[in-house]
Structures are given as C-alpha cells and as structure tokens.
A protein has these predicted regions:
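N-terminal leader/linker segments that precede catalytic domains of diphosphate-processing enzymes
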Residues: 1-128
Length: 128
C-alpha cells in the first residue's frame, strides 16, 4: 500500500474531498471521517387502517418481548441493510400479522427521531 503525499498548504480533508479519486476519497472517509458520526438503528412502523361500518380500525399488535412487553404497538421492526423502507414495511407486516400488503399501498407518513424514545439506543423510525 502506498502512502498518500498531501501537497503543502492543503489539508488532508481538502485533498481527499477535492483532488483524490472517488475511490480514494471513500476509502479515506470510511477510515477517517465516518467513525466520528453516531449511527442510529433504523426501524419502520406501519400505520395500517381500514374503515368498518363507518369507523376507522387501526392494526395494532401486543408486544411479546421487552422493551414495552405486553403493550400495544404498531406493526414494525428493524430494517435489513439490503432493503428500502417500503420493502421493510411489507416484510414486517407479513412476518408479524401474516398479511400481504401491496407496495403501492405503502406511503410514508413521517419520520420520528426523538432522542431517548427507545431504551435500546438511538433509533430513527420511518412511519408508513
């Protein structure tokens, strides 16, 4: 592995952000810059509802495990690295309540990132 020589008067960051190749920048970024940023877990929560006899019915589950064991909750869970939020919602609904939800019916409502809302750590959830 060759050592990169940074020209005089230029910061390491400036060199890699502006003058290096994209591959060199990404290699540097993953080693030098990325570790300084906290990383949240990303989850999805599905707000699934329907109308029955003129009333709105909301799909909730009862949590089987901690945290919030036995409490009512929206269907949801952690995203896998290989999926986007819509596919994560579709998978979680299928896993938790055995319902096949068409992707075209899934829309994003909001993102919740309130610090401390999940006792397991920093979690950002995408509500759909």
């Amino acid at each position: 592995m060759t050592e990169t020589i940074i020209p005089a008067g230029m910061t390491e960051r400036e060199y890699f952000e502006i003058h290096a190749t994209e591959k060199e920048f990404l290699d540097w970024y993953c080693k030098q810059d990325l570790p300084q940023y906290e990383k949240p877990s990303v989850t999805v929560d599905m707000v699934a509802y329907c109308f029955v006899e003129g009333k709105i019915k909301l799909l909730l589950i009862r949590r089987k495990a901690h945290p919030y064991q036995n409490c009512l909750a929206l269907v949801g869970g952690f995203m896998d690295k290989s999926e986007d939020a819509r596919h994560a919602c579709q998978r979680e609904v299928r896993e938790e309540v055995n319902l096949d939800l068409p992707l075209e019916k899934i829309e994003q409502l909001m993102t919740v990132s309130t610090p401390g809302r999940d006792p397991r750590g920093w979690t950002v959830t995408i509500a759909r």
